[in-house]
């Protein structure tokens, strides 16, 4: 309501008094904030996709010459936490093991987990990525021919599998997991 009236808002915070007036509010898809960190590169591509892999969702935004194409904004309702939950549940059911951490296997790092558990984790992670790629393809996005910029902590976790999978033609990774919050 106060935005429409453009009135000043007075408040106290930590013992100091403030008076502010909000003149303009902009809202962007979450993935775009991360894209800005790579703008000089992205503006040279006629088309690129920002793929922000989070805990509960994977958000996708199409860019044309570095600018958001808001006609193509997708959200896949399965992030890495849903992957973890699936792996943990299946591992418990098949091997009566409670997994605390499967990141080492996903990152292809040394682990004490037995071979069959490692294979299960790799297999389920591969299926997770395939399901996501199919979700995109159903919406007209083909990662085998597109430049894809991956953001978020989930993308760094899955980076090795994405690169080794050879399904994404031009993967670029934003190393800063806080890029969306800048």
Language-model-detected regions and their locations in the chain:
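Glycine-rich phosphate-binding loop plus the immediately following alpha-helix
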Residues: 63-110
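Nucleotide/phosphate-binding catalytic cleft detector across ATP-hydrolyzing
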Residues: 1-48, 68-80, 106, 114-182
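Active-site-proximal alpha-helical scaffolds that flank and shape metal-associated catalytic sites
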Residues: 51-55
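Short beta-strand scaffold segments in enzyme catalytic cores
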Residues: 58-62
